[in-house]
Amino acid sequence: MGGLQPWHWLIVIAVFVLLFGAKKLPDAARSLGKSMRIFKSEIKEMQSDSNAAKSDQPEQITSERVVVDPSTQSTSSNSDKRPA
């Protein structure tokens, strides 16, 4: 009940032909096709630019910390002492 049946489509097509004429319909369909192609190519270009921008960013390098256990270090060594 809610969908369009085939005779509904025939009425819609007849109205378009009466309003726009038989000559203008192919031209309109052709220009719509060109517009869709241009739109799709622009979308692909934007996606490739976005992917290229992501790959151009340098990776963040995390610094490594060296943990020194104070219990293993000697508190005094001969090289640390200054002569008087």
From Swiss-Prot:
<dbReference type="GO" id="GO:0043953">
    <property type="term" value="P:protein transport by the Tat complex"/>
</dbReference>
<feature type="transmembrane region" description="Helical">
    <location>
        <begin position="1"/>
        <end position="21"/>
    </location>
</feature>
<comment type="similarity">
    <text>Belongs to the TatA/E family.</text>
</comment>
<dbReference type="InterPro" id="IPR003369">
    <property type="entry name" value="TatA/B/E"/>
</dbReference>
<keyword id="KW-0813">Transport</keyword>
<protein>
    <recommendedName>
        <fullName>Sec-independent protein translocase protein TatA</fullName>
    </recommendedName>
</protein>
<dbReference type="GO" id="GO:0033281">
    <property type="term" value="C:TAT protein transport complex"/>
</dbReference>
<keyword id="KW-0812">Transmembrane</keyword>
<feature type="compositionally biased region" description="Polar residues">
    <location>
        <begin position="48"/>
        <end position="63"/>
    </location>
</feature>
<keyword id="KW-1133">Transmembrane helix</keyword>
<dbReference type="GO" id="GO:0008320">
    <property type="term" value="F:protein transmembrane transporter activity"/>
</dbReference>
<keyword id="KW-1003">Cell membrane</keyword>
<comment type="function">
    <text>Part of the twin-arginine translocation (Tat) system that transports large folded proteins containing a characteristic twin-arginine motif in their signal peptide across membranes. TatA could form the protein-conducting channel of the Tat system.</text>
</comment>
<keyword id="KW-0811">Translocation</keyword>
<keyword id="KW-0472">Membrane</keyword>
<dbReference type="Pfam" id="PF02416">
    <property type="entry name" value="TatA_B_E"/>
</dbReference>
<keyword id="KW-0653">Protein transport</keyword>
<comment type="subunit">
    <text>The Tat system comprises two distinct complexes: a TatABC complex, containing multiple copies of TatA, TatB and TatC subunits, and a separate TatA complex, containing only TatA subunits. Substrates initially bind to the TatABC complex, which probably triggers association of the separate TatA complex to form the active translocon.</text>
</comment>
<feature type="region of interest" description="Disordered">
    <location>
        <begin position="46"/>
        <end position="84"/>
    </location>
</feature>
<dbReference type="InterPro" id="IPR006312">
    <property type="entry name" value="TatA/E"/>
</dbReference>
